[in-house]
UniProtKB/Swiss-Prot annotation:
Predominant location: secreted
Chitin-binding type-2 domain ranges (all copies): 25-81
Family stated for the protein in its record: Belongs to the scoloptoxin-01 family.
GO molecular function annotation: chitin binding; toxin activity
Keyword terms of this UniProt record: Chitin-binding, Disulfide bond, Secreted, Signal, Toxin
An example Gene Ontology CC term for this record: extracellular region
Name this protein carries in UniProt: U-scoloptoxin(01)-Tl1a
Post-translational modification: Contains 3 disulfide bonds.
Organism the protein comes from: Thereuopoda longicornis
Localisation: Secreted
SUPFAM superfamilies: Invertebrate chitin-binding proteins
InterPro entries (alphabetical): Chitin-bd_dom, Chitin-bd_dom_sf
Disulfide linkage: 58-71
Length: 88
């Protein structure tokens, strides 16, 4: 695994924090599906086994990369699709 891939995986595992249940305004069609938040790049939703979206938050300096389905460095993501990054 490349250093970049390992770093991305580490960022996802360590810094993605389950903050609370949420509603992204979208429905889950299958479990383990990921949805981006339309108003905040720091937030994404993971669909649980009951097809309910669970609000997750990326760590500092990262945002949700919907193409790769990981929290990624802000320079690597298109934040126009996922809204603004929350102030730190």
């Amino acid at each position: 695994m490349s250093v970049y891939g390992l770093l991305s995986l580490l960022i996802f595992i360590v810094l993605a924090v389950n903050t609370s249940n949420g509603d992204p305004g979208k429905d889950c069609s299958e479990k383990e599906e990921y949805l981006y938040d339309s108003s905040n790049c720091d937030i994404f939703y993971e669909c649980d086994e009951s097809l309910k979206p669970q609000r997750m938050m990326c760590g500092p300096g990262t945002g949700w990369n919907q193409d790769k389905l990981v929290c990624d460095f802000l320079t690597n993501i298109d934040c126009t699709r996922g809204g603004k990054v929350a102030p730190k």
